[in-house]
Amino acid sequence: MAGKARVHELAKELGVTSKELLATLKEQGEFVKSASSTVEAPVARRLRESFPSAKSADSAARPAAKPGAPAPSTPATSAKPGGPRPGPKPAAPAPAAPAAAAPAATPAAQAPAPAAPAASTATPAAPASNAPKPGRPTPAAPAPAAPAAPAAPAAASTPAAPSTGAKPGGPRPGPKPPRVGNNPYSSAPAERPAPRPAPGAPRPGAPRPAPGQGGPRPAPGQGGPRPAPGQGGPRPAPGQGGPRPAPGQGGPRPSPGSMPPRPNPGAMPARSARPAPGGRPGRPGGAPGGRPGGGGGGYRGGGAPGAGAGAPGGGAPAGGFRGRPGGGGRPGQRGAAAGAFGRPGGAPRRGRKSKRQKRQEYDSMQAPAVGGVRLPRGNGETIRLARGASLSDFAEKIDANPAALVQALFNLGEMVTATQSVNDETLELLGGEMNYVVQVVSPEDEDRELLDSFDLTYGEDEGGEEDLESRPPVVTVMGHVDHGKTRLLDTIRKANVREGEAGGITQHIGAYQVLTELDGNERLVTFIDTPGHEAFTAMRARGAKATDLAILVVAADDGVMPQTVEAINHAQAADVPIVVAVNKIDKEGANPDKIRQQLTEYGLVAEEYGGDTMFVDISAKQGTNIDALLEAVLLTADAALDLRANPDMDAQGVAIEAHLDRGRGPVATVLIQRGTLRVGDSIVAGDAYGRVRRMVDEHGDDVLEAMPSRPVQVVGFTSVPGAGDNLLVVDEDRIARQIADRRNARKRNALAAKSRKRISLEDLDSALKETSQLNLILKGDNSGTVEALEEALHGIEIDDEVQLRVIDRGVGGVTETNVNLAAASNAIIIGFNVRAEGKATELANREGVDIRYYSVIYQAIDEVEKALKGMLKPIYEEVELGKAEIRAMFRSSKVGNIAGCLVTSGTIRRNAKARLLRDNTVVAETVTISSLKREKEDAVEVREGYECGLTLTYSDIKVGDVIEAYELREKPRD
């Protein structure tokens, strides 16, 4: 075949389909694209050797030569037609070692492969005990040549194994001509196959074999039993196996174009069923022209795979063990060339996968399978996820498919989408199923990591001790509602703030700075006023965190109240010193000593009782002992606190409260904790950012810079920051915007995870039923009030039949956008200390949106609670109307059975519910009185002592039965 062979041409030549041939090529490590692709000559040769149909003409034994055919050119024994088969000629006396040493098996690494055929055939097969072990070379020590001579009579006595005798001293016969179509060196006619070439002839289409690769590998078990060591005949010294032909003696190597075409396997002569004479020595009945050491007729050599025979009866070694260079291959064939067009060595087996395929399949295996979904398997690694993370975030951390996590959660009873925020418990449950430890990062840690990504820190003073300067103390006034906190601040500031508060209660945090004297020195003190109402728990906690010292105001006539205890807990949790101000000592019934005793239970022991807490009896209304209270505050601050900060660094602080001003936009009351805030600084507070355009103090005066412990109102935010958010100065607006955006996204995810109602598969039926839901939109004058109102509304205890959902919240007046959202979602708008803007009222009237305005927080809570209870399904209770006894029975073809009754108690009404009793046993539970007559006249009701006739929706009635009528009335909820 000229040039490279194509796959489909090889398939046609080998008698197989192209698909099978492509599969074989893939098993051998040769990857071709299609049947039209070409393959290299060594690959094509391996393919021809791999298919039995192609090897039947190459390696199978042939029958004897046909009558009339020309004899081979070599002086071999030929079979005469019609005559008896000649017996073996007795070997002539072989005088020298060359004749006896030629048939001896030589090691694969030393003996030349093309042994002399005449000398090989002259030596008959050795006895079974002397046969060499396959794959094992004989000892290298040369043995005397005598054992080879007496072996001739033994072989001659076997008529079934004729052999050609060697003539001593005569010329060696030349190599036999190769078969047509297999050897390109052949010049014989193509119409008749020629015998197999002798070992000395070069292999067609392949380089000259190296020493030790002369013959094909015999099949296992066909070479006879193995001889004991040392019985396989003498091992010749190097160079005694006959001269090696010179490179020019084999004829010129033809080009691929001059090679004759390979005959079709179907046109080759069939194998003979019986052994032909002239077979290989070592097994009777070999094919003519067989190689020394071969098996019987039609079989391969008797050596083990990958090893050569070692004694008479075994062929030359053909390569090493499998898997080694020069070894492997199919049994009886030469070893594969190491690294040539595929894997070196190694026998290609059909149906086996390569190591690469096995490795790829192993790497793609994933476990465990949760609910039929394959998930990655962890080794107890810790996965850090933000609060409110989605399954997509989780999948990105563990390199998994989000859809698989969704399916796994569905099988675990949770229905979520890939981008939906998931609560902490669900994430931990899913992580445990995959052997991961899910660690939900706290908001503080997440914010710290966010600032670290921008090389920012919060909460630490820069520089050393020499950079720190003293600052005023920050004092928070805490206590129960109506105990006089704001009046105390008014007395200290000599102002009147309380009258401006709705309902006389504080609903904001106010920050003020007061100048006072201590030992003749003027000292500044910053005061923060916190609400005392129960709804403002978060604001009190925020005030405790932003302060240095707390004044606990307790009314002497009221005692310790729930919000007093809560304020103590907030201050102790923030590790803040407490000074107790016992207020209202001027009122009747005031008992300051009782207050001291009650507070002892909470760890506040007065100094006069041996403790370390300072108690001051004051009257905020009369202004009694106010100076003593300020002195106690300053003394406690100087003794217990290190009030120093670095004023030269970028400002850091906390937003105490924030609101939306109609003319100025978002305004935040900020307490500077360290550094100095200046006009023009780029700032970020929570999810709000901006640039400081203006700063105003508590008196309304403009301030250019704010030092530590200075409360100011900051104008310039793009949105209203949350109360309690940390304020930070950054280098440029771009960084502030990026920090705010990421905080906003985190806040949204956490809020979505918190508000998502968990619905399991068991509750799916009931969840899909119509449920009552009250949607609210909250608008307030500042963010702290809106936050407190939302927390209070969510704290209303109500049945699961009704859900409360806050769909939007904000600071400022009610806008048209709020009205449109309320109209689309059937929501109610609650405005706290705000009113509708522009045409929002007209739009609300046109759309039918209800807007409620409140100025006191508990009024809003009470009305929302009533609305929620009104949305509940009514509760009915059963009320007995009366009883009637059946005295007679009448039958009618139109209405059925008619009962003549006497009303024994109460009243019997038409269409009322009833139950039928027989011998004080309920026969029918839900029966309706369908008709009622009195003296042949229809009646609506019949009272006690009167007779009546009635029909029931139950026909099995008897005389003596009792009819008990009742009705269901709605029961008011508590």
Swiss-Prot record:
Residues 529-532 are annotated as: G3. Residues 504-508 are annotated as: G2. Residues 470-641 form the tr-type G domain. One of its GO terms (cellular component) is cytosol. Residues 479-486 are annotated as: G1. Residues 583-586 are annotated as: G4. Residues 279-332 have a biased composition (Gly residues). Residues 31-376 are annotated as: Disordered. InterPro entries: EF-G-like_DII, EFTu-like_2, IF2_II, IF2_N, P-loop_NTPase, Small_GTP-bd, T_Tr_GTP-bd_dom, TF_IF2_bacterial-like. Residues 349-358 have a biased composition (Basic residues). GTP binds at residues 479-486, 529-533, 583-586. The keyword Cytoplasm applies. This is Translation initiation factor IF-2. The lineage of its organism: Bacteria, Bacillati, Actinomycetota, Actinomycetes, Mycobacteriales. The gene is infB.
